[in-house]
Amino acid sequence: MKVDMSTSVKDDAQLEASRVRENPPPMYKVLLLNDDFTPMDFVVQVLQQFFHMNREKATHIMLQVHTQGHGVCGVYTKDVAATKVEQVLQYAKAHQHPLQCVMEEN
């Protein structure tokens, strides 16, 4: 008796693909938090360097951080968000600024 495994593998792949479409990975917001010490220009620089924003958008987000206490830098998968947070925190610390960056589920 001959079994056609290619159909079974194909069906499994289609089933897995449909599961992925039904359940996308959870997304996380990366936020910068306001403080009274980090210069506004440094925040703009961080947004441009780590979140690839143009100066206008980075300035807009920086003003949100300044006036509202926090600003959303972007929305990413968990691993990417965690990496961005760590990069920003290390960069701020290296430049002796207390800038805080956190992530929260979207």
Curated annotation (Swiss-Prot):
Protein origin, superkingdom: Bacteria
Annotated region described as Disordered, given as residue ranges: 1-20
A Gene Ontology biological process term: proteolysis
Annotated SUPFAM superfamilies: ClpS-like (SSF54736)
Gene3D superfamilies: 3.30.1390.10
InterPro entries in UniProt: ClpS, ClpS_core, Ribosomal_bL12_C/ClpS-like
Pfam families reported for this sequence: ClpS
HAMAP family recorded: ClpS
Quaternary organization: Binds to the N-terminal domain of the chaperone ClpA.
Functional summary from the UniProt entry: Involved in the modulation of the specificity of the ClpAP-mediated ATP-dependent protein degradation.
Family, as annotated: Belongs to the ClpS family.
Annotated NCBIfam families: PRK00033.1-2 (NF000669), PRK00033.1-5 (NF000672)
Protein name per its UniProtKB record: ATP-dependent Clp protease adapter protein ClpS
Species per Swiss-Prot/TrEMBL record: Chromobacterium violaceum (strain ATCC 12472 / DSM 30191 / JCM 1249 / CCUG 213 / NBRC 12614 / NCIMB 9131 / NCTC 9757 / MK)
Chain's gene name: clpS
